[in-house]
């Protein structure tokens, strides 16, 4: 059975055809690709990865590297570091990121809400843009829910 992305998931990291999962209190490797995990989780929540990509693109106007909604009720939104077709693409759960910054080695450091840190060899501006897109998507979803109650 594929890994179920949940509120304790911090990040999904590629290891060839396997995936390293970072969770709140443990890290482990699963024998499945990131794309298969994400696709399965999208299907469990009533869509497909392509459907989620189109939905995100429509809501925030970003067609390249859009954030992906995994579970709208639990506010699980994935942030990709690259195109999902790139084998080096890492995925982060927006709600579990406390902060991120550029260190003295010019690497992006992501600090999660459990104080765990992950250093990435990425452009800070690109990562910042991805986080902002995901935040915009979350805000759009929240606004849509709020309008239902008015």
Label the predicted regions.
Residues 1-92, 96-150:
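Eukaryotic intrinsically disordered, low-complexity regulatory linkers and tails enriched in Ser/Thr/Pro
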């Amino acid at each position: 059975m594929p890994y179920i992305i949940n509120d304790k998931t911090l990040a999904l990291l590629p290891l060839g055809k396997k995936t390293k999962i970072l969770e709140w209190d443990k890290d482990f490797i699963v024998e499945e690709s990131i794309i298969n995990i994400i696709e399965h989780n999208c299907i469990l929540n009533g869509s497909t990865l392509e459907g989620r990509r189109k939905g995100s693109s429509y809501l925030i106007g970003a067609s390249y590297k859009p954030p992906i909604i995994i579970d709208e009720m639990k506010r699980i939104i994935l942030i990709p570091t690259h195109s999902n077709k790139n084998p080096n693409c890492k995925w982060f759960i927006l709600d579990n990121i406390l902060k991120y910054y550029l260190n003295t080695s010019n690497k992006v450091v992501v600090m999660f809400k459990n104080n765990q840190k992950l250093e990435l060899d990425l452009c800070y501006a690109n990562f910042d843009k991805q986080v902002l897109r995901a935040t915009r998507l979350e805000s759009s979803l929240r606004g849509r829910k709020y309008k239902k109650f008015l």
